[in-house]
C-alpha cells in the first residue's frame, strides 16, 4: 500500500492529493505511510506527503511521511457490539426497554457515511416481560438497512465527531408483555452517538481497528439531539395498548458501542482487517 501511494504521489503530484483531502472534518479515512521518492529537480529522494504522524498536522513543505486517503479501503466492513453498560431505550415518560446486548454489522460507504446491514437487540425486557418482534425469538429485535452520517459537534476541546443513525420509515414494530396482553411498540426516527477515544484505543485522530461510539440520554432526552445548526435527530416510540389506547413519546438510547473495522470473512485473517481513522483536526 505504501509503495502504491508513493508512486501515485510521484505521478500526480502533491496538488492531486491536496484536492483528495479537501473534505471538511470530521471524516473517516486512512493515514498512509509513504516511501521516499525523487521529485522533479531533486538530487535525492524525499518524502512528499502532506502530513506528519496521524495526518493531523499539515507539513507546509509537503515533505511529510504520511498522506491522507479519505474513506475506507477494500476491507470496509465493521462489526459493533454494546453490552457494558447494558443498552437501554427510555421514553420521556419513563418507560424502559432494557437489553443485554446490542450489535450491528455493515459497511463504511464513504468518508462520511456507513450502512448498517443488520442491527440486533437481544435479551430485551420491559417491566420484566420480554420484548420481541417474533414470538419464537424471545427478547430479540432486528432492524435492517440503517444509514449513518458522520457530522461535527462543538466540544470543550474543539471539534468532535458523531454518527447519526437514521432509517426511512419505522425501525421496527415489536411486542412487549405477555401473549395474552401485549403492548405493541413502534420505534421510529434517528439518533446521534458521539465518537470517543474509549480507553485510548479508539480511532479519533489516530489509526485504529477499534472505534467507540457513546449514545447518551437522560430520561428519554438524547445528548446531543442535533448537529450544530441542524434539525433535531431523535427517536420516538408509539405504544399501542389493548383495549385501544395509543401514545407517542420521544425516546433516548443509552449504549457504549465498540466497533471493529475491516472485519471481512473470515475475520481472523489479517488481510480482512484494516485500521481506519476519524479525523477531526483541520486539513492541509
Question: Where are the language model's segments positioned?
Answer:
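Bacterial N-terminal signal peptides
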Residues: 4-15
Amino acid at each position: 500500500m505504501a509503495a502504491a501511494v508513493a508512486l501515485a504521489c510521484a505521478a500526480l503530484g502533491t496538488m492531486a492529493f491536496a484536492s483528495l483531502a479537501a473534505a471538511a472534518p470530521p471524516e473517516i479515512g486512512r493515514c498512509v505511510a509513504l516511501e521516499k521518492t525523487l521529485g522533479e529537480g531533486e538530487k535525492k529522494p524525499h518524502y512528499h506527503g502532506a502530513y506528519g504522524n496521524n495526518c493531523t498536522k499539515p507539513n507546509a513543505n509537503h515533505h511529510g511521511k504520511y498522506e491522507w486517503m479519505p474513506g475506507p479501503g477494500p476491507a470496509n466492513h465493521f462489526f459493533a457490539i454494546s453490552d457494558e453498560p447494558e443498552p437501554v431505550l427510555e421514553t420521556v415518560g419513563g418507560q424502559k426497554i432494557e437489553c443485554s446486548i446490542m450489535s450491528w454489522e455493515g459497511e463504511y460507504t464513504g468518508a462520511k457515511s456507513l450502512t448498517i446491514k443488520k442491527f440486533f437487540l437481544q435479551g430485551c425486557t420491559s417491566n420484566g416481560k420480554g420484548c420481541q418482534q417474533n414470538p419464537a425469538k424471545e427478547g430479540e429485535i432486528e432492524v435492517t438497512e440503517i444509514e449513518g452520517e458522520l457530522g461535527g459537534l462543538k466540544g470543550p476541546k474543539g471539534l468532535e465527531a458523531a454518527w447519526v443513525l437514521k432509517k426511512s420509515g419505522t425501525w421496527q414494530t415489536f411486542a412487549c408483555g405477555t401473549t395474552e396482553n401485549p403492548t405493541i411498540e413502534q420505534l421510529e426516527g434517528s439518533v446521534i452517538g458521539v465518537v470517543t477515544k474509549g480507553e485510548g484505543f479508539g480511532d479519533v485522530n489516530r489509526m485504529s481497528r477499534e472505534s467507540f461510539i457513546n449514545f447518551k440520554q437522560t430520561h428519554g432526552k438524547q445528548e446531543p439531539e442535533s448537529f450544530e445548526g441542524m434539525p433535531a435527530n431523535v427517536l420516538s416510540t408509539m405504544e399501542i395498548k389493548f383495549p385501544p389506547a395509543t401514545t407517542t413519546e420521544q425516546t433516548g438510547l443509552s449504549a457504549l458501542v465498540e466497533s471493529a473495522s475491516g472485519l471481512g470473512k473470515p475475520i481472523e485473517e489479517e488481510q480482512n482487517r484494516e485500521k481506519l481513522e476519524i479525523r477531526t483536526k483541520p486539513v492541509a
